Every structure is written in C-alpha cells, then in structure tokens.
Amino acid sequence: MHAVLITLLVIVSIALIIVVLLQSSKSAGLSGAISGGAEQLFGKQKARGLDLILHRITVVLAVLFFVLTIALAYIL
C-alpha cells in the first residue's frame, strides 16, 4: 500500500509540474506591476478555453497531491 501511494504521489507531482508549466502567464510580471501595469495585474481576467481546462486540472492535481501526502503521513 505504501509503495502504491508513493508511486501515485510521484505521478501526480510530475503531472502537476507539467500542467503548471503549460499555463500561460496572466500578467507582465513584477516589472509590469511596478511600472504602472497594476490595472492588468489586479483586474478580473477569466480563463477561457485551454487556460480554463489547465486551471481546473491544476486544482484537481493539487487536491490529489495534498490528499496523497496526508495519506502517506498517516500510513508511516
């Protein structure tokens, strides 16, 4: 059981890293916030299309990551 949970945790971790890297950036970064791009940084921007799907997958994988981590902590 322990080996299965560790294997699942590694798979979820790698998938989470890949999905986060595939997401597009939402702002110009820190330089945009300092030089007057704050309206874009704090404005409401809804994800559409592929960004929405990647966002939802990220949330699901993050929840799985925490559940698996807590499960492994209690098994040890």
Curated annotation (Swiss-Prot):
Question: Which interval of the chain is the signal sequence?
Answer: none
Cell compartment(s), UniProt:
Cell membrane
Give the species: Bacillus subtilis (strain 168)
Which signals induce this protein? Constitutively expressed, part of a 5 gene operon with multiple promoters. Not ethanol-stress induced.
Topology of this chain in the membrane: Multi-pass membrane protein
Task: Report the main location listed first in the record.
Answer: membrane
Q: Which UniProt keywords apply?
A: Cell membrane, Membrane, Protein transport, Translocation, Transmembrane, Transmembrane helix, Transport
Q: Name one GO biological process term.
A: protein transport by the Sec complex
- Superkingdom, taxonomy of origin: Bacteria
Q: What family does the database annotate?
A: Belongs to the SecG family.
**Can you provide one Gene Ontology molecular function annotated for this UniProt record?**
protein-transporting ATPase activity
Q: Which GO terms describe its cellular component?
A: plasma membrane
- Relate the protein's function as given in its record: Involved in protein export. Participates in an early event of protein translocation.
Protein name per the record: Probable protein-export membrane protein SecG
Its transmembrane ranges are 2-22, 56-76
Q: Does the keyword Protein transport apply?
A: yes
